Amino acid sequence: MANYQNATELSKLTLGKSTQYCSEYTADLLQGVPRSLNRDDLALNQSNLPFVGEDVWYGYELSWLNGKGKPVVAVAEFRFACTSDNIVESKSFKLYLNSFNQTRFSSIKDVEKVLTKDLSKIAGSEASVNLFGVDHCPALDIAKKSDKCICIDGEDISIDNYQYDPQLLATAQDERSGSQIEEYLVSHLLKSNCLITNQPDWASIYIHYRGKAIDHSSLLKYLISFRQHNEFHEQCVERIYCDLQQFCQLDELTIFARYTRRGGLDINPFRSSHIEQAPFARTLRQ
């Protein structure tokens, strides 16, 4: 359980509370969560983060009316820099997007401008918004598995700890190689729970690193220990990044978690020691 679950900033959220749906554009529905809540807990300095990256969201339930009242639908891609002040709370994001349903816009560019303005304001940093027709969206292509990507889910492990335990990484420095290696790993077994509602969050997590070899069994046990942990998607990924660097002291590290969608949105946090922009990599479960 996160140490900041009872923070005042969280008690103000509509998440976990009964709400009414609004079908007329309402920017005030958006709510933000300070990134500092999690980062203070990790002893991270917002002005000197140990990583770069972004949060990439895809919205599959966005619709509005054109100037003649005819419905228009689109798939939306939203990108927020990890240096922004706030993450966007997902329920408020869903309610906000729903408020476009009965609102008229002259063009898709007008919708993009409104989304960019509102989301940049709530995030505290410039947001990137791209809208695609459902037949012309790069996000809809399922990424092919790289031959270099190793799935660690087949490790024959015994486990009875489903509470977050970073000490499981204490033995993760594999002695099979004294020299540096480069590996691209994936696990589809990451599950955590919403900090407020306790709803399950499911993800495939990709870990690309260069350094001394990481023991796959220890890493898998560590990832599974998030199974009963309550924290937002972005916060879990930053915790994983920091833990891996603390225990494994890697020269390069990139983590990309692809969460399954809820309420028409999927969230995909990307953190890296050296790469700022996440790739297109939609998984089968998204």
From Swiss-Prot:
Keywords: Cytoplasm, NADP, Oxidoreductase, Queuosine biosynthesis. Substrate binds at V88, E89, S90, H233, E234. GO terms for biological process: queuosine biosynthetic process; tRNA modification. Pfam families: QueF (PF14489), QueF_N (PF14819). One of its GO terms (molecular function) is preQ1 synthase activity. The active site is at C194, D201. Pathway: tRNA modification; tRNA-queuosine biosynthesis. Its EC number is 1.7.1.13. One of its GO terms (cellular component) is cytoplasm. NADPH binds at S90, K91, R262, G263. It catalyses: 7-aminomethyl-7-carbaguanine + 2 NADP(+) = 7-cyano-7-deazaguanine + 2 NADPH + 3 H(+). SUPFAM superfamilies: Tetrahydrobiopterin biosynthesis enzymes-like. InterPro entries: GTP-CH-I_C/QueF, NADPH_dep_7-cyano-7-deazaG_red, QueF, QueF_N, QueF_type2. It is found in: Cytoplasm. NCBIfam families: QueF (TIGR03138). Homodimer. Catalyzes the NADPH-dependent reduction of 7-cyano-7-deazaguanine (preQ0) to 7-aminomethyl-7-deazaguanine (preQ1). Belongs to the GTP cyclohydrolase I family. QueF type 2 subfamily. This is NADPH-dependent 7-cyano-7-deazaguanine reductase.
